[in-house]
């Protein structure tokens, strides 16, 4: 699968059934394959049809030479590739979760996304409680970076059913995903739906209180020292401390 943006190390997504191919100078901790049956509880139609493997995910990957620096800073790089197609009338997407409270930070840490190929929407809502708070749908393409603030519910959505979505992300090495709040509401506060022409539209989830959804492009993160157009992995290699804000960041996306 050809990438539209250079991720900064030798990795090729193969498919949601095969995972990834890595260069000889890279390490990984294996690939997980997320099945449709494992995400049904968070879909608008839990009985929908869709690909058996919704996405393939590899947590903890990169150049072998960089692993000690990543471990020392409690940072982890993960990669995900989605199936093409859709889940009933919804696009291919993740379930939606909150990051668990990190043992070494004592709080739910943020995540730095970078899109490699495909069209993405990073959906986020301020809370997993009945009042979801502020809700955003950040539209992103190849090379775009989106940061999810700490403690926010978030889901990654493929906005183009005709092609797979692939992306990488920096997060806390002591990561973990909390799904209970989202599943208790039968999904996120706004469901993405696909029109007959393959375009996204949004409908509120009645299990939550009324909220407003703001659709927006990615913001500029130069205030956090990030360089637009350069892969976030390469930026880490140039300055391994650059992403320590992942463990300290408190601003909005």
Positions of the model-derived regions?
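Conserved small/polar residues in nucleotide/adenosyl-binding loops
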Residues: 249-253
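Short, conserved beta-strand element in jelly-roll/cupin
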Residues: 107-126
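Double-stranded beta-helix
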Residues: 130, 159-247
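Conserved metal-binding segment of the jelly-roll/cupin
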Residues: 140-160
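A short, N-terminal "cap"/entry segment at the start of jelly-roll beta-barrel domains
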Residues: 1-102
